[in-house]
Amino acid sequence: MLLTIPELLDAAQLAEIRRLLADAPFTDGRYSAGADARRVKHNEEVDPSDTRVRALNQLVLMPLYRHETFQAAALPRKLSGAFFARYLPGMQYGAHVDDPVMGPEGGRYRTDVSVTVFIGEPQSYEGGELVVETDFGEQQVKLPAGHAVIYPSSSLHRVSPVTGGERLVAVAWAESMVRDPARRQMLYELYQVHEALRRDNPDAEVTRRAGHVRANLMRMWADV
């Protein structure tokens, strides 16, 4: 399931993120990639040891974690820190699958859900589409600043070459309470049905049953 989250960040948050990134030290993005991805990765990322990263993470990850759609769709158990990536003309990220397990010793997490938050406006760069392979074919994603997209980390994906301007994004990963993406999608669709029923018929028996079914499926599938 590929899902967009519109307007995750507001104008003030975006302005502060851009201010912090303006003079942040960027390093070769290959340093953070696994062995296979390193061969096809060509971008730059903010040095994770830089003092700005803490503030940048708070600006991006707190709104993400609190967002109702993210909670319902990703069912996060853990959320990684964010990587702040820059693509200049000629840079790209070839087709790859994210590493299944990330993080340092003592802080490992399974990557179930990948997140990209767009920091720059789409008209500020040429090319640079995020391309995700899904059951319905390739999906190209290039969203307005402040919007986010989430998709299963098991998906083959790439970033098309940037031919002009500067592509700025934040990327992160969630370990989900439900590791199977098909089950997560089913639970999210049940959530949508239940929310619609609660809005239109809050006291109906079918509303209670829909909530009951979703709760028991979570109990059956959740890994906590």
Curated annotation (Swiss-Prot):
It comes from the Bacteria. Keywords: Dioxygenase, Iron, Metal-binding, Oxidoreductase, Vitamin C. This is PKHD-type hydroxylase Tgr7_2199. Binds 1 Fe(2+) ion per subunit. 2-oxoglutarate binds at residue 167. It is an enzyme of class 1 (oxidoreductase). PANTHER family: PKHD-TYPE HYDROXYLASE YBIX (PTHR41536:SF1).
